[in-house]
């Protein structure tokens, strides 16, 4: 089962992302566990055992880029997909080995393309 997390400090955006992800996974008939977090501190307090993490950059307190750096330093090897309004942070995302970078408001076709690529990459990973 694929484990997916969404970390965004805006409740509406968390709910929208959860709905998009659930809908996509149901459409593809792929079982998943979906977890939602309201900030970087929350996700760092979890077991971080997610295959895919959708992470907002601009959040109150700890921003998503800082959370991503700390997660990578603690051994998180899953896919990071940033979701943000900040187009200018795209180059910094490479420093934490981001899988993709989605700009809000999300385009449905771009989201689906990213999900398809992420799931294909997971299937190809050994183990």
Name every feature range the model reports, one short phrase each.
Residues 1-3:
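Non-catalytic signal-transmission and effector/linker regions of two-component phosphorelay proteins
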Residues 8-10, 85:
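Acidic di-acidic motifs
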Residues 9, 40, 57:
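Residues immediately flanking
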Residues 11-35, 73:
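Two-component/phosphorelay signaling modules centered on CheY-like receiver
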Residues 19, 41, 69:
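Active-site phosphate/pyrophosphate- and oxyanion-stabilizing loops and adjacent acidic/basic residues
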Residues 33-52:
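Acidic, metal-coordinating helix/loop segments flanking the phosphotransfer/catalytic sites
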Residues 50-126:
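CheY-like receiver
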């Amino acid at each position: 089962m694929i484990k997916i997390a969404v970390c965004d400090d805006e409740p509406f955006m968390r709910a929208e992302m959860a709905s998009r992800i659930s809908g996509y996974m149901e459409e593809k008939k792929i079982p998943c566990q979906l977890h939602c977090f309201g900030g970087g501190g929350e996700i760092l307090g979890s077991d971080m055992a997610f295959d895919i993490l959708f992470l907002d950059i601009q959040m109150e307190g700890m921003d998503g880029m800082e959370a991503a750096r700390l997660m990578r330093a603690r051994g998180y090897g899953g896919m990071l997909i940033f979701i943000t309004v900040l187009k200018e942070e795209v180059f910094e995302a490479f420093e934490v080995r981001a899988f993709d970078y989605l700009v809000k408001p999300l385009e449905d076709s771009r989201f689906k393309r990213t999900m398809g690529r992420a799931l294909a990459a997971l299937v190809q990973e050994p183990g």
